[in-house]
Amino acid sequence: MAVIGALPKEVAEAVSASRLLVVGAGGIGCELLKNLVLTGFTNLDVIDLDTIDVSNLNRQFLFQKKHVGRSKAQVAKESVLQFCPDANITAYHDSIMNPDYNVEFFKQFTMAMNALDNNAARNHVNRMCLAAGIPLIESGTAGYLGQVSVIKKGVTECYECQPKPTQKTFPGCTIRNTPSEPIHCIVWAKYLFNQLFGEEDADQEVAPDIADPEAAWDPTKAAERANASNVDGDIKRVSTKQWAKSTGYDPIKLFNKLFRDDIKYLLTMDRLWRKRKPPIPLEWASLHNKENCSEIQNESSLLGLKDQKVLNVASYAQLFSKSVETLREQLREKGDGAELVWDKDDVPAMDFVTAAANLRMHIFSMNMKSKFDVKSMAGNIIPAIATTNAVISGLIVLEGLKILSGNTEQCRTVFLNKQPNPRKKLLVPCSLDPPNPSCYVCAIKPEVTVKLNVHKVTVQMLQDKILKEKFAMVAPDVQIEDGKGTILISSEAGETDANNHRKISEFGIRNSSQLQADDFLQDYTLMMNILHSDEMEKDVDFEVVGDVPEKGPQKPPEESVKNITNGSDDGAQPSTSKAQDQDDVLIVDSDEESPSSSNADVGMESASLKRKLPDEEAVSSTKRKRIEPPVEEDDDIIALD
């Protein structure tokens, strides 16, 4: 071990004695595991739920073609042991969010190192490390950009201390009625996949939206004008999946319904097209007449990289038909009630989305996109670069050595930029910021105000949309602070399922009510103040009032804010950078930029920001017996106003 021999004796001993948790065995994880064992770390635990795909092989060098389909964590362990047989590595093919990996599990480790590609897992590991009191080194890459930061309870900002831009969403009426950008058509195609072959979601409907306020039309009159309600395409208001099943997933009938009849139906909404170019319906028969059939492009005849070619409309129609037939067969093989899950690396699923999206783009007069472009946009993919992962994994180890040497004050958030800044720096270190006193996770008393309509929000929505999605809880328990200890939501299976579809107002929740939400796995408690409003914006179910403010207007010099996602769909790490022209990255600390609020100034994506309740102020986690919701009384109704 050449590296450990060059370390001071005390640090070398700490390295040998330490036990590290590596979360993620992908692009960064492979490089990190290699660096750790070559540095002298021998006691490692690595966890990853993912399996190896062919697309991983160009940069995740611990894997080979023969490993495709196997656990990343297990194969990474086997590969590392080939060049470091003395290492003691434990591999877990599992999700880090599994309740088995509780606070006691995390307390086994000297520190944790994240090599993740999704925000939900990052939030969870952040909270578990705070609860266990161990340092966490966070990291992320996006193309040429990268970042490494250190998180230590009570000393630095936690991962959720600063706001992150939420993933961009689009109004349902835009997706369904008036797409104006290719991404709108791609989102529609992904929704269509789920509506036909996957789990149906009412929020992912693809049929024309007759409730579009911009249309302001008379549906009855329009339906009379539309000569497409019950002919061929059967534009009856049944679910898309029911209709598709009734046709036996006939590709031609699906094509004519989606790209002819539904478009004709849209054209009857006159007002939508007064200032827009109206869509042009497609007809299967006209696309496949003799003249067009001769123009259909055979993939095998395409020169160059076929995934980067844009086909013609007839070819995309043919691709749509072939992919529907393949997916139909996959459903049949799985049996009744089976569902498919869309995966960007599944060829038939990707072909389906590519074809459907491009046909819709053509209908709405947009330039069509290659399969490569559609895949990048559909998966929110920023192509990963092996060199970036290598640089970032090296920086993770350097920060880890600082922690083990007892020099946490020397730790830095380091940004890797695509281009050198005027000072010719590619690596830019910034001082670590102290905890944000307003953070929803690591503040002394986590508390938040949520604005919503108590007469419309259900218990299920409170659990799924607010607590799990917004506040990233895994298994929340919710108690109403009404003096009775009413249990609204229980993490025990089936205990409060009867409440799910009831409005929260039915439980006496009104303006100024307080809810205590506990996640026992994360050792996290959040007090939620309810602010009732009858005037929520359209398509907005709730708002977090006074979301964590960003720290000042500071802006990373020379480089605009970007999101670091490690090539994933929900990103997570800040990116801004400056450059460094020295080979020895250890000297980055000597050339610090002015305080940058490492996480505030960069686009750490999505997720919610929360606070952590310390042990000394933690509310007892003993679950209370569920109490039935109070009987509604007149004064309750008056109080709601």
From Swiss-Prot:
Gene3D superfamilies: Ubiquitin activating enzymes (Uba3). Chain: B, domain 2, Ubiquitin-activating enzyme E1, inactive adenylation domain, subdomain 1, Ubiquitin-like 2 activating enzyme e1b. Chain: B, domain 3. GO terms for biological process: protein sumoylation. Residues 546-641 are annotated as: Disordered. Zn(2+) binds at C158, C161, C439, C442. PROSITE patterns: UBIQUITIN_ACTIVAT_2. Residues 548-561 have a biased composition (Basic and acidic residues). Residues 562-579 have a biased composition (Polar residues). Pathway: Protein modification; protein sumoylation. It is found in: Nucleus. Signal peptide: none annotated. The active site is at C173. Keywords: ATP-binding, Metal-binding, Nucleotide-binding, Nucleus, Transferase, Ubl conjugation pathway, Zinc. Residues 582-594, 630-641 have a biased composition (Acidic residues). The heterodimer acts as an E1 ligase for sumo1, sumo2, and sumo3. It mediates ATP-dependent activation of sumo proteins followed by formation of a thioester bond between a sumo protein and a conserved active site cysteine residue on uba2/sae2. Heterodimer of sae1 and uba2/sae2. The heterodimer corresponds to the two domains that are encoded on a single polypeptide chain in ubiquitin-activating enzyme E1. Interacts with ube2i. This is SUMO-activating enzyme subunit 2-A. The gene is uba2-a.
